[in-house]
Amino acid sequence: MAVSARAGIVVTGTEVLTGRVQDRNGPWIADQLLELGVELAHITICGDRPADIEAQLRFMADQDLDLIITSGGLGPTADDMTVEVVARFCGRELILDAELEDTIANILKRLMARNPGFDPGNFDSVRAANQKQAMIPAGAQVINPVGTAPGLVVPGKPAVMVLPGPPRELQPMWHSAIQMPGAQEAIAGRTTYRQETIRMFGLPESGLAETLRSAETTIPDFGALEITTCLRRGEIEMVTRYEPGAADTYAQVARLLRDRHGDQIYSEDGSQVDDLVARLLADRRIATAESCTAGLLAARLTDRPGSSGYVMGGVVSYSNEAKAELLGVDPALIEMHGAVSEPVAQAMAAGALQRFGADTAVAITGIAGPGGGTEQKPVGTVCFCVLVGDGRNVTRTLRLPGNRSDIRERSTTVAMHLLRRALSE
């Protein structure tokens, strides 16, 4: 593939480095760069020490990158040192931008005016305390703040884009930031790519790997495709990036996948199973009955906007007594087959269907561990039932791998796919 403009991301913040706060900026910026056709070479995370930040910038510069993007360290406190470090790295003097200082002051004044105890007479001290945020490297291009922290682009080779740490500020600022002349000049060599996503469920990763090895030896110009695969909770996501001229090569690979794994492919347009289920549930009424997943399936179904139009309700029946009292499961059925069994899953689904006046119900009962397993029903044994009012009934028992959290999450994914298949028939 042709060499594109290359970028690196430096995420700053001791709270991110130590894991107290999850990095949401690096992956998000990476997606934006991918859409622009900019090759991401590195993402690094460092603490707030100036020497560590500068070391990351120099490492990035040594990789011959066109653009370095930093996030974090733009506040008014003593440990917010990113701008000062970037100025030193770029060999630029720090100067006070009077217009920017006024902009920040006006934002602060509006924010403080919401406080009934705000005394305008004390504002000068607040303005002085935040003056640091108006200090910028000479020649830097200013990106208007969303909060109080402005962003910056310092032109050069590499250009440096400086963005705030909070995602709620960084993300709205991105479009303006990447349109800055310094940023546009840095990524002028970007390549136009197409990107396609195929999602599969029920296919071992080794099965996909074998098919791709076959494609590599039988499809001309296979090397023109940049293919990445990711296995998540039993689903496989295959993302392919290519230049427009390789469209026919990708089409051949997609055909090969359909021929070999058509039953496992559930999306070729990037849609997730949650999106597909939401569409299939339009004009329906669904209820859930959950034991080991304790409401995770109901939470997932209601995560999509508009779900109130089709989700009637759910029952978490963790105990046998709750299964009997809330869902009408016959205690004798539990005594005969055990709480983790297909007959009980069917009875739970039927109870949810009746209790909520729904036309579709999903039930999950299982052993998430680490205790509770037996030789006959080891940890990871989960029973599912999808019941549709017209008589369709899909029941499965699976042994799911992983720890307690893995088993619970995988169970919700399996339930979503069983629901998708039942409603697609």
From Swiss-Prot:
Disulfide cysteine pairs (residue numbers): none
Pfam families per UniProt: CinA, MoCF_biosynth
InterPro entries: CinA, CinA-like_C, CinA_C, Competence-induced_CinA, MoaB/Mog-like_dom_sf, MoaB/Mog_dom
SUPFAM superfamilies in the record: CinA-like, Molybdenum cofactor biosynthesis proteins
Domain of life, per lineage: Bacteria
Family to which the UniProt record says this protein belongs: Belongs to the CinA family.
Record protein name field: CinA-like protein
